[in-house]
């Protein structure tokens, strides 16, 4: 997933030598359950230090868990692992299978990082 800034005038916000970036994106067209949905920030040399919270699609049907898959040192690679999500009855999650296309969904998330 490539994150695009919500409002270029407002983001990224500098906090010390790091930046807070709020953006939106669409999950990948062909999800890979093993590697997840690799996350990057568009238009900047931006390395992600942390992703704040879970990622939920705007229609509430999918929930994503951000994971540092390339280690925890500087410039770690982050991926989102997607699950179907239901609030009816007993809330439940089920892993999205490989090859599933959820690219029509949209989500918003916040990352901290910098160049």
Write out the residue ranges for each language-model feature.
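Extracellular receptor-binding modules and their adjoining Ser/Thr/Gly/Asp/Asn-rich linkers
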Residues: 1-37, 103-115
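Extracellular attachment/recognition segments
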Residues: 28-96, 101
């Amino acid at each position: 997933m490539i994150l695009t800034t919500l409002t270029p005038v407002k983001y990224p916000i500098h906090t010390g030598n790091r930046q807070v970036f709020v953006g939106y994106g669409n999950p990948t067209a062909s999800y890979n359950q093993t590697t997840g949905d690799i996350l990057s920030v568009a238009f900047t040399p931006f390395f992600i230090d942390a992703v704040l919270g879970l990622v939920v699609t705007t229609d509430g049907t999918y929930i994503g868990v951000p994971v540092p898959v390339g280690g925890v040192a500087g410039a770690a690679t982050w991926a989102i692992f997607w699950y179907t999500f239901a609030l009816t009855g007993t809330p439940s999650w089920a892993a999205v299978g490989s090859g599933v296309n959820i690219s029509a969904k949209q989500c918003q998330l916040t990352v901290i990082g910098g160049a």
